[in-house]
Amino acid sequence: MRLSVSLLALAFGSLVAAAPNTKPRTCGSKPSMEFLAKSAEFAAKEASGELLNSLATIEVETYFHVVASGRTPSQGYLSDAMLANQLRVMNSDYGPHGIQFNLVRTTRTVNANWARDGDELGMKRALRQGGYNALNVYFLGDLGSLLGYCYFPTNASPGSTAFIRDGCVVVGQSVPGGNISNYNLGKTATHEVGHWFGGCFGSGDGVSDTPPQRSSTQGCPSSRDSCPGGGVDPIHNYMDYSYDVCMNQFTSGQRTRIYNMWNQYRARG
């Protein structure tokens, strides 16, 4: 699912020199029909108690890839401290649900074309590491009108295009210490990794304890109820599109869905 950010989107600029951008974000792409069918199947089984996750914890082999146009922060070259803070945010957000990200390796590449997402497949062929149970996060210097995007789990054989593309692409400016006002606390990575686990947006995720929404949340309202009768909107949920400071929760149903998706698609590697 791609996170669009320009008018309904957020233009990328310098980590240091650019003025903070405060435009809202929204999601511009849809999960595949295969994924939606599997989600509906899981929803039915979870509701009946037929399908329950069996793992107590998930440990995720994690690789960070910094892809910049040059060797300065303004060109997307993130420091070790910024990456450490991003990992800390991810573990803080997922840790209460028994999920831990173990950083195995960080790579840094200077390639102006890759840094602006000019050759996604070529970049990932060169940089991707680990099996299908390994999370690869690519921090790019310039995503144009995008804040980030990630691929939902599927039946991907090693070496296939789906296997190579797997992972999350995040604009480097969104990590803690970046300069995007309202979106620089590292929650973009948390949100995108949610898609990697199989989490979807609350308006149609099929999870029983996430109320339906007519549209994604923008900003950080005190309360919102876009679908009267279904419960107030989950504006604090990591899979919504609120400001970073507003995001602080997954539901127990989302945890169950993440574990079931993990068992289905990623646990075997």
Swiss-Prot record:
Annotated GO MF terms: metal ion binding; metallopeptidase activity
Gene Ontology cellular component annotations, sorted alphabetically: extracellular region
Subcellular location: Secreted
InterPro entries with a match to the protein in the record: MetalloPept_cat_dom_sf, Peptidase_M43
Binding residues for Zn(2+): H191, H195
CDD domains named in the record: ZnMc_pappalysin_like
Gene3D superfamilies hit by this protein: Collagenase (Catalytic Domain)
Extent of Polar residues compositional bias: 210-225
Annotated GO biological process: proteolysis
Disulfide bonds: C220-C246
Glycosylation, residue list: N179
Residue numbers spanned by region Disordered: 207-227
EC class name: hydrolase
Active-site annotation: E192
Domain of life: Eukaryota
The EC number(s) this enzyme carries: 3.4.24.-
Signal sequence coordinates: 1-18
Keywords in alphabetical order: Disulfide bond, Glycoprotein, Hydrolase, Metal-binding, Metalloprotease, Protease, Secreted, Signal, Zinc
Family, as annotated: Belongs to the peptidase M43B family.
Known role: Secreted metalloproteinase that allows assimilation of proteinaceous substrates.
Protein name: Extracellular metalloprotease UREG_07765
